[in-house]
Structures are given as structure tokens and as C-alpha cells.
Amino acid sequence: MIQLEPPFRHGTQGDAPALAELINVAGEGLPWYLWTTMAEPGESAWEVGRRRAMRATGSFSYRHATVAELDGRVIAALVGYPLPDQPAPIDHDQMPAMFVPLQELENLTPGTWYVNVLATCPEYRGRGYGTRLLGIAERLAAAAGRSGLSIIVSDANAGARRLYERCGCSEVAVRPMVKEGWVNPGENWVLLVKRTG
């Protein structure tokens, strides 16, 4: 685990409410849409998101999170993890269709450190938190022996894409979105990579 300086720190279970909100911001509403389908009777989509963030395992876990905290409030977050050197084949019978293009893109970058979530609360954007979190992601990638960063973004999210490109990421592949009932102006998922090793 790398050392972090304030306002950055490693995530905790107590960050679950903020992480759920920020993953939904980064995912442009897709997480909330999915959580509504996963909710138990009487459980809200937000409760599902918080429950998933509190898990010790899984891709969306506080254990994979780095947060920026100001005055006791989490205002930005990075969630990421190392991808295996050999991706597992996609099981089209088990994986929901809307995830297949995302998994196809992820599988194109084995051995990288995958930035699953990078989000800043709207009122704190433009202050360098995203750039600094990407710098932390590079340090985490190096500590994990990964060859670079990989990120998937909607083609409609021009602001995020500008940030990633400004930080040295380049487009390497595109896949059409499968939306089902999710509403989003994007048409494609774009895979960006920054090679560091």
C-alpha cells in the first residue's frame, strides 16, 4: 500500500455512502440503473450501492478506493485495481449483455491497472483532484507491477476524456454501448490507455 498525503487517503467502509454517489457520477447513472435491478424488496438502489461499497471483495469495494477528503467530507474518489495478465474468457450466457462491451475492452489491456471510477463532486471540479488522483493511480500501478493505466469512458463524456488525454492516455479501442433501459447520450465505450512500464 502506498503512502498518501492529505487530503488523500485510502478508502474505508465508512466511505460507502460517498463512494456510491461518486461511482454513480462517474458511471453516468449506469450504477444506479443496475442497483435498481439488484434491490431486494424494500431496499433502495442507494442502499444496494452502499452495501456493495462496504464489501471487502469485488471490483467496487472500499478496499480499492482512494478518496480526497475536505472538512470531513469525501469530495473525490478513485476506485481501481490491477487487471490479470491473462483475461478470463467472457461467458456470454452469464454476463448481462450491457456489460459485454465493457468486458471486451477491459480484456484488451491485461497487465494494466484499471481505473474503474474517477469522480469529483461537481462543486470541487476544476481544482486538480482528478489529475492528482490519476497520479496516485500511476503510483498504485507501479507498486502493483502493472504496465500502465486503462480507463473506459463514454464517448459523450468529453470532460472526462479531456482529463484522461491531458494526463497522457490515448484511445486504443471502441465498442458500441448496449443500453437496455439505461438512458445515456453516448453511443460508444472508449478504452484509453497510458503505458508507464
Predicted feature residues:
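Conserved beta-strand in the GNAT
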Residues: 67, 73-82, 114, 119
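A short beta-loop-alpha structural element at the N-terminal edge
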Residues: 7-22, 29-34
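Conserved acetyl-CoA-binding loop-helix of GNAT-fold acetyltransferases
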Residues: 120, 126-143, 162-166
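Conserved acyl-donor/pantetheine-binding loop and adjacent beta-alpha core of acyl/acetyltransferases
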Residues: 82-117, 179-180
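A short helix-loop-beta-strand connector motif used in the catalytic cores of GNAT acetyltransferases and
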Residues: 54-67, 83-88, 114
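C-terminal "cap" of GNAT-fold acetyltransferases
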Residues: 97-100, 147-150, 154-161, 165-167, ...
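Conserved GNAT-fold acetyl-CoA-binding loop/helix
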Residues: 27-53, 64, 90, 99
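Conserved GNAT acetyl-CoA-binding A-motif
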Residues: 111-115, 125, 134, 141-152
